[in-house]
């Protein structure tokens, strides 16, 4: 596996976000809609003890899910991380342009409930143990990361979640039409149109989930192609 191929992805994403600031559209992902319901249901069941639900979003991209969480829930506060400075700049602009009016029941704006940070998760997660109620990431785990890097990342997610915290992530799976198409990078990573994707089967999900209890795995289709995803819900033991 050529590490250079993996490392060059950050610049490729930077350029893509700069040239296509709405490349994923404005509507939230179906996975984010599902995650919001799960996070709020945990609060209702008193799994989350604080008044707010503090979640961290990894690989937030251009913020379509970040802003959805903040604008459509009186409970959820989001810390959004992405290694692209263009992505974080875009989220911050949306906060100012569209989400700064105080529309929440507590007098806050949706923008008040979003914190952003430029950060590469290959370097860990820069927060203390037991900080967050939940974690959400849409197709981050299936980016240009090796299996060992994904295992390390999931251990970091486990560390920053509070006991009983929920981790919800999506990955493209080996039934996807792009699997084994394009340039083989190594493991189950393939490059198409400049983007590297790590494809998952359920065995790999189990492999990276040793610290968690897997509560749910279901399949979701996204887009017209479509991308074929697993949506995984884990709970910190």
Where are these regions (language model features)?
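Short conserved AdoMet
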Residues: 145, 162, 210
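A short SAM/SAH-binding and catalytic strip from SAM-dependent methyltransferases
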Residues: 134-148
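A short acidic, Gly/Pro-enriched loop at the edge of an enzyme's catalytic core
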Residues: 122-135
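A short glycine-rich, Lys/Arg-flanked "PGG" loop and its adjoining helix->strand segment in the class I
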Residues: 151-163
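Surface-exposed loop/turn positions
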Residues: 131, 164-165
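Class I (Rossmann-like) S-adenosyl-L-methionine-dependent methyltransferase catalytic domain
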Residues: 1-124, 167-237
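Non-membrane alpha-helical structural segments and their capping/turn regions in soluble enzymes
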Residues: 85, 147-151
């Amino acid at each position: 596996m050529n590490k250079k191929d993996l490392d060059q992805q950050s610049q490729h994403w930077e350029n893509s976000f700069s040239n296509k600031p709405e490349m994923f559209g404005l509507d939230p992902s179906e996975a984010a809609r599902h995650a919001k319901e799960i996070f709020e249901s945990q609060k209702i069941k008193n799994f989350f003890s604080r008044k707010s639900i503090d979640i961290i979003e990894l690989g937030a991209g251009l913020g379509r899910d970040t802003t959805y969480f903040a604008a459509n829930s009186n409970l959820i506060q989001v810390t959004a991380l992405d290694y692209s400075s263009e992505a974080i700049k875009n989220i911050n602009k949306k906060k100012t342009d569209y989400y700064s009016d105080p529309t929440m029941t507590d007098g806050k704006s949706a923008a008040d409930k979003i914190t952003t940070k430029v950060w590469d998760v290959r370097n860990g997660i820069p927060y203390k143990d037991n900080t967050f109620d939940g974690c959400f990431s849409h197709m981050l785990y299936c980016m240009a990361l090796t299996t060992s890097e994904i295992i390390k990342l999931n251990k970091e997610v486990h560390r920053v979640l509070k006991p009983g915290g929920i981790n919800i992530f999506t990955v493209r799976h080996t039934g996807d039409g792009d699997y084994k198409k394009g340039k083989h990078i190594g493991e189950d990573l393939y490059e198409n149109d400049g983007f590297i994707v790590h494809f998952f089967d359920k065995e790999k999900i189990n492999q990276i989930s040793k610290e968690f209890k897997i509560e749910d795995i279901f399949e979701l289709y996204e887009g017209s192609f479509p991308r074929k995803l697993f949506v995984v819900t884990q709970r910190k033991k």
